[in-house]
Amino acid sequence: MDSPAHGQLAAPSAAEDATAAPRRPALTPGGGRSRGAVAAPRCEHLAAAEPQGGAQAPGTDSAPGQDRVEGLLLGLAAGDAAGWPAARHRAARMPEWTRRLTRELDTFAEQNATTTLPVPIALNQPPEPLRLGPSDDAEWAAFAAETVLTGFGELFAGLPADRRTRAAVDLAWNTLAGEIAAAADRAPEVESAVLPLRARISVRAGLGNLATGLRPPATGHDNPHYFDDAACVRAVVLAVVHPGRPHAAAELAEFDARYTQDGDGVHGARAMAAAVAAALGGADTGAAVEAALEQLPDSTEIGRNAAHAVKLARDFADEPAGAFALVPLLEHQIVDHVYSYGIAAAETVPVALALTVASGGSVSAAVPAAACLSRVADSAPALAGALTGALGGGAAVPAAWRDACRTLAGCALPRLAGTDLVELAGLLARTLAEADHNSR
């Protein structure tokens, strides 16, 4: 089935091209996995059924309970808020001059050798955007949640159950690409276009590739940040479609990840989806992490890092300060300080898995420890929070964090401003429960 048309799409901008990092040697997408021809028609891209195989976690194929879905979303949001980059992301809602002034103060500190470093500022503006709260990761997670709801809505009611979510994923990405193309068409030049979102380099590049007519897996493979963890944040939410079925969740996560990632970026999404699906199905911490490890090939950087990180974590699992005690080891043996950005899935996913083990699945222990790893604080705390939140449920997230993190600011996806994650979790749980009931 073809998705609805989305209008004329534009080529990626020169500004996007300027962000490109040196490309690693091209690999067969997904280490040999294939969805068919790179330029396959949309109907062929959606044709593959969501697989039924793979090891099953404890529990059944029934819909996940609202408490675990709530824990997943609130844990992710709390982790997102806990990392220092959240304030930078939320500052996007402040007037541009406030961010310019912060940059100027940073330059002043560098040139004058001062150790008083600037932080995001409000000055004479309302400071609400700079208060503790979720930022980009939580908003892209909500984007994935909306996609799930669309898949189980009336639009795709005529499709087989195993194709509905995939059709919704395809529609979501092409709609977004169409919105960006329309914004570019309205601007006198592409660089001055007012875009309807803020996103990772991999997502912007993937959307640009869609705009030129490419299809997955090319949109993720021909991508300067194919290795980042942007798809992992979406993957943990897509896992709600397959509670207790890690392999099926991993396959769905890969389908989505191929729009923006390749290589370790895809492997990381598969791993996080498998772990969360296991947790939603009732698996304990060890089984959930093992489900993730099963998705990571030994020959990959992410596979080697994850195996090593989890081995380190198991040595600290019985210590009262296990997760916090593990931080220096992860900093020195897993986290890389060479590249410009700390968003490689080969680092953030192993960190999240290791801290889940070392904390015994406690969101209150895993998230603060992940936030201590400043290099990967943009997403590792969110990933750790999502998994431990799914393991512990909504009640495991402290009330103060729940209150501070349940409402989205709209700093990455402005249309989501005001979205209540508790209400979204309830809607997801009810929708999936109804679909499960109707399928019996």
Residue ranges of predicted features:
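Structured, active/binding-site neighborhoods that engage oxygen-rich ligands
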Residues: 2-440
